[in-house]
Regions:
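Sec-dependent signal peptide recognition
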Residues: 1-4
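C-terminal motif of bacterial Sec signal peptides marking the signal peptidase cleavage site
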Residues: 6-9
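Bacterial signal peptide processing site
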Residues: 11-14
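Post-signal peptide N-terminal segment of mature Sec-exported envelope proteins
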Residues: 19-39
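Compact alpha-helical subdomains of small soluble proteins
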Residues: 43-103
Length: 103
């Protein structure tokens, strides 16, 4: 996950062709972060869980009717705009906390 964040954050600052709207992006990011944490915690080494993680991520993207490419380009767009990216991550944390309270 850190590698993905580093690569995407350091990409050129260009507007994505079809940036995913903030609310939808928050929903997707929340699910992506949770599934990444699950696999990192359970397996430790990326080489052990990468194929399974990719399948799980593809299911998340399919559920939200976006491609991996659309998600990654939108992630890059928001990451290149620190204020918006911070807002997205704060909303992801808020959403995660709300889900914990309602369980």
């Amino acid at each position: 996950m850190l590698f993905l964040l580093t690569v995407l954050c350091c990409s050129p600052h260009r507007k994505a062709e079809a940036v995913i709207q903030k609310e939808k992006m928050v929903q997707i990011m929340t699910e992506v972060y949770l599934i990444e944490m699950h696999y990192q915690k359970g397996y430790g080494m990326p080489s052990m869980y990468k194929p399974r993680l990719d399948i799980a991520l593809d299911e998340i993207f399919k559920k939200h009717d976006v491609s991996r490419k659309d998600y990654e380009s939108s992630f890059s767009y928001y990451a290149a705009n620190p204020k918006e990216f911070l807002e997205l991550n704060e909303l992801v944390i808020q959403r995660y906390n709300e889900e914990l309270v309602h369980k």
